[in-house]
Amino acid sequence: MTRTQSYTSRANPKGSGYAALGGALATSRRYAANEMRRLCILMSAARFRFYAELNDFLPDESRGKDLTRYFSAGGSVKDFVESFGVPHTEVDLVLANGKPVDFSYPVRNGDRVSVYPVFESLDISSVTRVRPAPLRALRFLLDVHVGRLAAYLRMAGFDVLYGNQASDDDLASIVARERRVLLTRDRYLLMRNAVDRGYWVRSTEPKQQLLEVVKRFDLTGSMRPFTRCLDCNTLLEKASRESVLERLPPKIRDKDVFRLCPSCQRVYWEGSHHERMSKLLRWVKANVPAPPVA
């Protein structure tokens, strides 16, 4: 027997073994595909469509199109919406087969569900079933992901708690107890049932975040710049130069206008930092579109 013949005689059984394995795998794949088709026929199905900026939460291939979800057991429309990665706090209107529903609506076989974000220029208060009751005044809670934004919002005069050391459970509890709006970059935090008001901040740059939030909540007319302590959020009080003189650097003692935080005793005056922050607020206001003419 030649060397080639000897090799061939040993190789052929091995080759036939691989062929058998390949055939078995192909059969297994066909079986799995057929089984999946059979299950899809037996299971219920509903179609979902997300509009406008809600597509930010979807993968590129799922944006702007109908998405079919198969299910064997029903669930609330809130659960289905969040299974796509969209927090319920981002949703302002849900239509099931063309009719407004709330988040507890049980999704059924054949349902066509349309999910909309906040409407900027259209009043849908008489239609929506998912929007929480309006707040008398907007108060915010920010987590560790948006710390610089917390300082900017306080600088603009808004009541802002900054939970940089708080757990997710603590943050959700504060939102529910104090009726605050949660601002975060963590979409899954917004999916907690206790969080009924919140917003997922898209931008990662703090100044753009400030502009984004001012636009989203229409805050331009509510700004009260330099009225809150940047450290502890307390409202500032006017202070005479004499009352704070000992706390001032020598080059600041010729200033006339001072504010004092009654809580942490920090003193504020109109220096270079004040001018930079004023410039930032002017930039924000200049980049907020004017309201539509009625």
Residue ranges and their predicted role:
Residues 239-242, 272-274:
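Short Cys/His-rich "knuckle" micro-motifs
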Residues 89, 100-103, 109-224:
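Long, charged N-terminal interaction/targeting segments
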Residues 2-10, 28, 255:
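Low-acidity, Ser/Thr- and Arg-rich intrinsically disordered low-complexity segments
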Residues 37-139:
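Ubiquitin-like/PB1-type beta-grasp interaction modules and other compact soluble beta-rich domains
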Residues 246-257:
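Short linker/helix segments within small regulatory modules
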Residues 234-238, 269:
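Short functional micro-motifs and their immediate structural scaffolds
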Residues 226, 258:
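Residues immediately within or flanking Cys/His clusters that coordinate Zn2+
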